[in-house]
Amino acid sequence: MGERGPAKKKKKKKFGLFMQQNLLLSFLLIVLIFVGLIVRLIYLNYSDGDKYEKRVLSQQTYMSNAIAYKRGSILDRNGIVLAESIHVYNLILDPLKIRSKEEYLEPTLKALRECFDVNEEEVRKIIEEKPKSQYVVYQKSIEAEKVEKFQALVKADKDKTIQGVWFEADYKRVYPYKSLACDVVGFTSAGTSTGIEAYYNEQLTGEDGREYGYFDSELNLERVVKEAANGNTVVSTIDANIQQIVEKQVAKFNKDIGSKNTAVLVMNPKNAEILAMTSGEQYDLNNPQDLTPFYKKKQLDRMSEEEKLEALNRIWRNFVVSDTFEPGSTFKPVTVAAALEEGLISPKTTFYCGGVKNVSGSHIHCAKRAGHGTITLAQTLMFSCNVALMDIGEKLKAHPFYRYQTNFMFGSRTGIDLPAETTGYIFKEENLGSTELATSSFGQGFNSSMIQIASAVSALVNGGSYYQPHLLKELQSDKGATIETNTAKLIKKAVSPETSAIVKNALFETVENGTATAAKVEGYQIGGKTGTAQKLPRKDKKYLVSFIGFAPVEDPEVVIYVVVDEPDVADQAHSTFASELFQKIASEVYPFLNIPRTAVEEEHDKGNAKEEVSKPDEKDDQKETPADGITPAGQVAPSVGDEEGSEQEDFDLPVADQSSSASNIYE
């Protein structure tokens, strides 16, 4: 073998000048970048330090809790609380905390059982299924007393084993008088609201506050609180004492006699303030969806959810503002006032009633087939003579009659501050033919609501001023300071004081010697008018009877309107139940309001009502014979006809309908 030669040595790479320069440049670049960052940080610290500090702190938020506002109260005119929000608590579970130590679970469950109506298995399930949760709302609207009892147990727990339970402050809406004025006050719950609660929701509603917590730069816990803005208080015109009187008498009537529905409205004619209002079923505002007071369990079991909702809507519906019927004879004073204003009649005008009037070839009878004979203007209202009213309507003609109907807000909303007010139906001027005018003159062929009739009569007896009916008396802050005072709103001057005086005196005679003697209250001068309406279908012989009265006659301070829908008697048409119920209510309301007593035997200006005329048979004229009425379009309310004076022979009364003749459409 040959010999190996000597091994070759590896050449060492030299760190050349070029590489040294590159390394130096890289180092300098890094230094420059680092210096630039330092300069930038210094700049930001001085120029935008506060802004960035706040941004960082905002990202370190510890907690954020809503602070519930308190909804404003609803009071009666004297400060009696009808609706308020009370302080309650929501029970919050913190499963993460409860599970953090084994010894926490059982003592905590035991304390919950002692103080609250809890389902232990349900709580265990929540803790197991949400082990990392720190916020589970378990119960709502817990009274403060129960919370205080639980907190006392926590305080007495020396081992500190009751953990993971805390309470969130909240408010609960309560109605101290339960069903009192339920149609007016209304309720707010589960996304539904009615009455004042609905109409003045914006004023009653406040704004939630919020509590924030975070750690500052030194890790100190900081709290920022934005206080809640509470809602305003609504002071209503309702008088709780008068409301109680009304509801007591209606309840007694329903127990003794009964009806499909009984409604009463009490208002001050001088400013149109509503003092009391009731209609339909009375329900507990604290539990408005409870149907058990109205239906048996078997009935409820058979009802679908849709049927239950329909039943609730019927119960919640306010008949006074949302339902309509033919006003009948309660409208007659409006026709008389219109003709007086136009100078077509006077208190000395006389009329002859032969028991029937031929209108465009059709015979329309008066209630008294034999006729009333010659009667004065006052006696047309005293004895509710349809023939005389048709004569007056004929003198008026269509245009003035329609103008006065609209002046008294028939066919329009009155503007009362309650939701779901209806307009009713009246004939348009171009549809007021001779027959339509004749029947409308005595209150038949068109629909109106209780609030429309009461507001119109108030204007007739207060000197002629039509005020907007209202329920708001005052708006207050949550501290009780007055924000707004609701003064009487004059809509228009409907008739003159002279006309008002004549009508008042005629209505006084109606109570003293006419069709409304059952409404008399000893010691008080009362004016008023009866009404009877026949409902559809006619063959069922179902009627709605009514009476509207005011006192004292010289200077009316209160109007009371009573409607009894289908009284539980055989002869509904000739019943005087509305007048009698008025009498019972007025007998208590007048003394309560300090209405001055005046002996009715004293001389009183009766607008020439004492003139010597052929006097009808009072017994016959105190009956009211209903006639055919109207067929409503799209109404939920039962439709009714009129009353005491239009028996017909082979004649169908014209009606104002939605499709062609109604001046307004129900909404």
Describe the function of each predicted region:
Residues 2-5, 83, 216-217, 221-225, ...:
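Beta-lactam-recognizing serine transpeptidase/beta-lactamase-like catalytic domain environment
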Residues 1-298, 324, 399-407, 519-521, ...:
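Periplasmic/cell-envelope proteins involved in peptidoglycan metabolism and beta-lactam response
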